[in-house]
Amino acid sequence: MNKYTFIDLFAGCGGLSEGFYRMGFQALAHVEINHWACETLRKRMKHYGYKDWSDEVLEQDITSDNCIPNIDKVVKGRAVDIII
């Protein structure tokens, strides 16, 4: 069975995502504007077996014009089951 996938908007340091990971979901992208929250999130995701999160953690303002295109690049056409 394939894992359900999700994108985390306003991700913070990944607390809500962590619950989804524990339930077996797979993240495709996280969007967060705060640098230190992104750094924490990158470290936490390594704990869950993600080898390199430099691209999947988008450190940017979600209201910027290039945010949605950047999410599309990271998702790479994969199906998104949930947006949190």
What are these regions (language model features)?
Residues 1-84:
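Conserved active-site and SAM-binding loop architecture
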